[in-house]
Amino acid sequence: MKLELLIPTSLDEIPLKHYQEFRKTVDTSNDAEFISEKMVQLFCGIELKDVVKIKATDLSDMIDHFNRIFAVKQTFKHRFKIGDIEFGFIPNLEQISWGEYIDAEKYLSSWDNMHKAMAVLYRPIKNTKGDKYEIIDYEGTGEYAELMKFTPVSIAMGASVFFWTLGLELLEALGDYLEKETKKMSKTTTANKRSLGNSGDGISQSMQQLKEIFSTSIESQNSPLLKH
């Protein structure tokens, strides 16, 4: 019997839940052959037992294909649909609540929880006017987290990079502001110069640590899918 494969042409066609399972396989297995088989099983929607029926040259071509589509930089999208529900990204991140920010940062740190992160950042649109829209209030991830497993992985990658990049920009702006304020304060009194200098050093170190966290998170989104 001839084996039929539906090979995704872009990350728009791969649901988040399949990529999460693939990432889990990569993190827990050192068997390159098994990882390759799981990749084809998950992304092409076939049984694992059928993967061994594929010609070796074809499998190698498929690995190259998936590496290429995962290497494409994903653009950030404000809105997308799952079934009949249209979801919108938080319209103004500068007005994000503390609860939203803490949950988003926590869940974005692990692909296992990326569906929960999507349930924080994207919520059902309740009103639309032109290009503007309103989303429902944030009340935790319980209601939509499971549904978000069907988010195209392209949406998840674009949103996570956007969030971390914006966070890095905000940190840099805050760091510049604090540095200027520290210099102003150090000029007001000679007596406090040493203590203020130490405080400034501490602030700089903390900012640098946070920047490294944001930068590492962004880089992890762009790592190669699979080597062979």
Q: Model-derived features: where do they sit?
A:
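Charged interaction scaffolds used for protein-protein
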Residues: M1-H228
